[in-house]
């Protein structure tokens, strides 16, 4: 039923905008511009006296002298609708029209039905191929020692995108498939990446032959250029090595023009087909073999240095007959000032620093398989947050000095996030022990609790800034794919989940350091304790859901 739709910031802002303009009954017609009538507050300071604000500049634009008519004020105050937060109070102040949510009702609505807030707001259909050029065979299979940090960044972004899009309902495949038990596959496993593999003896020769014939017979083959270029004997031998008895040249510029594609490099001209390109095209063809062309999108996740080459490959695939929508996710470089470092060295450095930090805190306890697993996950978390927390088109600069170390206390990065997630595990372990000992009763159903007991400003901040908007954040990659223009590049905000988790961890840590959740086992204190436990249980599930999109399992201690 529409009334049971989870609360949504977007739905609330749209409804408020409609009410302020006097067209609340026509929410579907409200443009994105109208959403700017209202601002959702997020700082603790502003949330003390309002949750949404329509500034005076907006009011004076809409109404003479900024005087809001009484019927409009009434419409805002009595606002209802699918996904709309319950309105508690409205007031015209010197800053504008402020709106306060009925917080008790909001806590009850969210905490008594948390599951919709932990998954994307909508489920979609379609197929997405995520292609990672850094992993394609050139002379030999890539290895951790030959993998540059910029290439590692593209792999982590590809992995994160795949996890997000699968949760949004898409069927996702990855390209290329890698040889089983190869060094690169084992390295990716240490980072929590389950990349598709094939037997070592597997070949893709049939599909390479298919791609070769498709290009030889392509309408975009530039035979005039081929005729004008005689090959030496050495070039003929090299061509035979490439599987091509004669040069095959494709007019990529014509492909771009005929397909009316935007955003491609204007210097794309005529390209000679290399064996490496045939292998790449064969992998793309194999990965999309079971996908219907009409609903398939290919995302090429590549570094800025390799963008031109990948544009060439994309247009060769198109010239060979592929009809999938192709977009490029371009990633900025990774810089390590004063140091040359490959992916394997970087991972080993962070692992050594993580082990050292753990030994300083826990001493001789840090040994055995359990601790090996914890250190591996924490290292993976550190690497992922360092390489994913920046907008993917921007450069990342890493501090890779051996003595810089890592800390669980500093409010940044994967270690801090995992530490605060582990604190929630410890809290609920302590509560469950208290239940076993008879100190506390089981948490009753949310409908039996009085959520007006949640008066701490940090409690509302955690609900309003994190629990309610989370599903909308998970939904944004698919929204961008669906609605952004059809240029070659697409920007998918792959940094959002990491930044969201770091911000959440700062606010949760501040709250948890101030508030004693498990109080004295006195009946008159139980209602507030149970309300807080429900809030923090929802936060724990949020952590797990967000970390799952990064392929990071939560850990019980740190």
Curated annotation (Swiss-Prot):
GO molecular function: arginine-tRNA ligase activity; ATP binding; tRNA binding
Alphabetical list of Gene3D superfamilies matching this protein: Isoleucyl-tRNA Synthetase, Domain 1 (1.10.730.10)
Ranges for region Disordered: 213-240
Gene Ontology biological-process annotations: arginyl-tRNA aminoacylation; tRNA C3-cytosine methylation
Family matches, as SMART domains: DALR_1 (SM00836)
InterPro entries with a match to the protein in the record: DALR_anticod-bd (IPR008909), DALRD3 (IPR037380), tRNAsynth_Ia_anticodon-bd (IPR009080)
Name under which the protein is recorded: DALR anticodon-binding domain-containing protein 3
Gene (UniProt): dalrd3
């Amino acid at each position: 039923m529409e009334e049971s739709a989870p609360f949504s910031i977007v739905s609330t802002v749209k409804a408020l905008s409609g009410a302020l303009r006097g067209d609340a009954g026509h929410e579907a017609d409200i443009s994105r511009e109208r959403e700017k009538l209202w601002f959702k507050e997020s700082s603790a300071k502003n949330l003390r006296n309002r949750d949404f604000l329509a500034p005076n500049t907006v009011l004076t634009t809409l109404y003479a002298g900024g005087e809001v008519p009484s019927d409009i004020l009434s419409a805002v105050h009595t606002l209802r609708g699918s996904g709309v937060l319950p309105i508690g109070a409205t007031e015209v102040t010197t800053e504008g029209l402020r709106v306060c949510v009925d917080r008790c009702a909001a806590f009850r609505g969210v905490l008594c039905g948390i599951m919709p807030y932990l998954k994307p707001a909508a489920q979609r259909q379609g197929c997405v191929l995520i292609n990672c050029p850094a992993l394609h065979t050139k002379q030999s299979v890539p290895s951790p020692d030959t993998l540059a940090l910029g290439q590692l960044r593209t792999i982590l972004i590809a992995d994160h995108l795949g996890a997000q899009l699968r949760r949004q309902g898409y069927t996702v495949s990855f390209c290329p498939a890698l040889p089983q038990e190869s060094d690169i596959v084992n390295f990716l496993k240490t980072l929590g990446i389950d990349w598709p593999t094939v037997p070592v003896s597997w070949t893709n020769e049939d599909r390479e032959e298919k791609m070769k014939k498709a290009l030889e017979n392509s309408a975009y083959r530039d035979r005039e250029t081929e005729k004008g270029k005689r090959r030496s004997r050495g070039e003929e031998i090299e061509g035979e090595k490439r599987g091509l008895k004669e040069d095959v040249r494709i007019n990529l510029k014509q492909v771009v023009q005929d397909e009316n594609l935007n955003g491609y490099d204007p210097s794309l001209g005529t390209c000679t087909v290399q064996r490496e390109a045939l292998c790449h095209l064969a992998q793309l063809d194999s990965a999309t073999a079971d996908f219907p062309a009409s609903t398939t999108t290919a995302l090429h996740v590549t570094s800025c240095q390799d963008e031109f080459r990948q544009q060439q490959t994309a247009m060769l695939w198109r010239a060979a007959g592929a009809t999938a929508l192709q977009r490029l996710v371009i990633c900025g470089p990774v810089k390590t000032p004063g140091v040359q470092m490959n992916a394997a060295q970087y991972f080993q450095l962070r692992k050594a620093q993580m082990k050292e930090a753990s030994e300083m805190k826990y001493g001789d306890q840090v040994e055995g398989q359990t601790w090996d697993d914890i250190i591996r996950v924490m290292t993976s978390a550190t690497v992922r947050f360092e390489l994913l927390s920046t907008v993917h088109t921007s450069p990342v600069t890493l501090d890779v000095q051996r003595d810089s170390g890592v800390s669980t206390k500093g409010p940044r990065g994967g270690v801090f996030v995992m530490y605060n997630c582990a604190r929630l595990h410890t809290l609920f372990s302590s509560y469950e022990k208290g239940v076993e000992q008879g100190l506390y009763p089981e948490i009753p159903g949310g409908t039996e609790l009085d959520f007006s007991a949640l008066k701490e400003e940090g409690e509302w901040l955690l609900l309003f800034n994190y629990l309610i908007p989370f599903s909308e954040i998970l939904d944004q990659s698919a929204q961008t794919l669906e609605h952004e223009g059809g240029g070659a590049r697409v920007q998918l905000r792959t940094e959002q989940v990491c930044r969201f988790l770091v911000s959440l961890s700062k606010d949760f840590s501040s709250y948890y350091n101030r508030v004693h959740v498990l109080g004295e086992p006195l009946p008159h204190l139980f209602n507030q304790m149970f309300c807080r436990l429900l809030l923090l249980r929802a936060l724990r599930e949020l952590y797990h859901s967000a970390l799952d999109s990064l392929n990071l399992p939560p850990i019980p201690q740190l």
